[in-house]
Design a protein with these regions (language model features):
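C-terminal structural segment of proteins
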Residues: 1-247
Length: 247
């Protein structure tokens, strides 16, 4: 049993916004893999909850008219890992979220929840920073988009204003085309553990594959929010692809 004051079930994004405005202290819940655990521990006891789990309009992955990859905020980790668009263009994200918890968590946990909780150790967080992701937010005043590095404000806090809801994460075509990368997770255990630190790197090579044309390096748990490593990126850009440069 969970100690909650009330549970409201949103029927649409607009209805979720209306519920948020009517109940400003309520907690949004989707998969519930974080919120319900916190409630069980008494940290959110007596809270009102707004469930958005039934909103299929913000679930799924597609390429938009500009060939940007659009990931609905209710898309689960398992769906992301298996999705052919992810596998073809940004498989590093699929690999990263496949390291979250166990199969049960990945089957119900969502990319939106993983980013909206503002936790720097989230496996998706550093990976999305390395993809120059854009966060789409829908609220009373319409839709706004901002770079993911601006979405994270401080530890446990993201840029969601009263009545707003994260509805998608977008990877622009120019952010993924020609890039390849890897995500490395360090943790106390090999599985079922949060990251002690996480590092995601995406590299774009020259046509002859001998020079680093561009690189993005992002870390989780290196600070209160996920962060890029601009000095390391600048040092590597334009350099030959050698062990000396990589190390």
């Amino acid at each position: 049993m969970y100690d909650m004051k009330a549970l409201y079930e949103a029927t649409s994004v607009q209805n979720a916004i209306e519920l948020r405005l009517a109940h400003p202290e309520a907690q949004i819940i989707a998969g519930g893999t974080d919120v319900l655990v916190q409630m069980r521990e008494g940290k959110r006891a007596g809270k009102e909850l707004i469930s958005i789990q039934g909103l299929d309009e913000i679930r799924g992955i597609c390429l938009d008219e500009n060939e940007a990859i659009r990931i609905g905020s209710l898309t689960t980790f398992s769906h992301i890992t298996r999705n052919p668009i992810i596998q073809k263009y940004i498989n590093v994200l699929g690999e990263a979220v496949d390291m979250v918890g166990g199969p049960q968590i990945r089957n119900i946990g969502t990319i939106g929840g993983n980013t909206c909780n503002g936790v720097t150790s989230a496996d998706s967080a550093s990976t999305l920073h390395a993809w120059d992701a854009i966060v789409e937010i829908t609220g009373p005043e319409g839709v706004r988009r901002l770079p993911i590095h601006d979405f994270y404000i401080k530890a446990g806090k993201v840029d969601l204003r009263p009545g707003e809801l994260q509805t998608a994460i977008i990877i622009p075509k120019e952010a993924y085309e020609g890039y390849h990368g890897h995500y490395i997770k360090y943790a106390m255990r090999n599985a079922m553990d949060i990251a002690t630190t996480g590092c995601s790197v995406n590299v774009k090579l020259s046509e002859d594959k001998k020079t680093i044309k561009d690189v993005r390096i992002a870390y989780g748990v290196a600070g209160p929010v996920p962060m890029r490593a601009p000095s390391a990126e600048a040092k590597a850009k334009g350099k030959p692809l050698t062990k000396a440069v990589v190390h």
